[in-house]
Regions:
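Divalent metal-dependent phosphate-bond-processing catalytic cores, especially two-metal-ion Mg2+/Mn2+ enzymes
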Residues: 1-11, 21-49, 91, 108-186
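His-Asp-centered metal-binding catalytic motifs of divalent-metal-dependent phosphohydrolases/nucleases
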Residues: 53-70, 79, 100-107
Length: 186
């Protein structure tokens, strides 16, 4: 597999984040770096195809955003709704089914098969790499993951998820169960 390419600034990502930065609040820096890491992994799996770049960038900015916009532990559908609404409102021209699918299936345990399979599967694999902090590698080398993580450090992102599970669910255990039931797909 080719060396991983890391883009440290993505204009589209920064502009998409801008209206939501205050909503995300203190979790912004950690979430932003999570988004950059997952975009980096997904674009690697897609061979840096420009055909998918705008979709991947948009999907990852929005993929967890329902945690903050809707304060929801079952955040996939709220995240999809915000992404689809903004896609229509701002006329980005992204395929709504591909955008929805990349968000909806990013926690799927097993390989995604279906419409828009290539991009959805790349996004799914990318998020699993980052969600597990590299324990699941999906074919990437440890050194590639370490390289990406050194450029975009965690900055407490995974701890933020645990805090939100507790805040929204009443306890870390109950919140963790609600999150798992609400977002994991088979």
């Amino acid at each position: 597999m080719a060396d991983i390419i890391i883009k440290t600034h993505r204009l589209r990502v920064e502009s998409l984040f801008e209206p939501y930065r205050s909503t995300i609040g203190k979790d912004y820096d950690g979430y932003r770096n999570h988004v950059y890491r997952t975009i980096t992994y997904a674009m690697h799996f897609l061979g840096q195809s420009q055909e998918y770049e705008a979709l991947v960038e948009t999907a990852f900015v929005y993929h967890d955003i329902g945690l903050w916009t809707d304060r929801a532990l079952a955040y996939l559908e709220p995240s999809e709704a915000v992404a689809l609404e903004d896609n229509a409102r701002y006329g980005w021209g992204l395929d709504p089914e591909a955008l929805r699918g990349a968000i909806h299936w990013h926690h799927k345990l097993f390989r995604y098969r279906g419409l828009h399979q290539e991009v959805i599967e790349a996004c799914r694999k990318a998020d699993w790499i980052d969600a597990t902090q590299g324990w699941i590698r999906k074919g990437l080398s440890r050194s590639s993951i370490a390289k990406v993580e050194s450029v975009f450090p965690n900055l407490g992102f995974h701890q933020s998820l645990m805090r939100l599970a507790k805040d929204y669910g009443g306890s870390t255990l109950v919140g963790g169960i609600k999150v798992t039931r609400g977002i994991v797909k088979w």
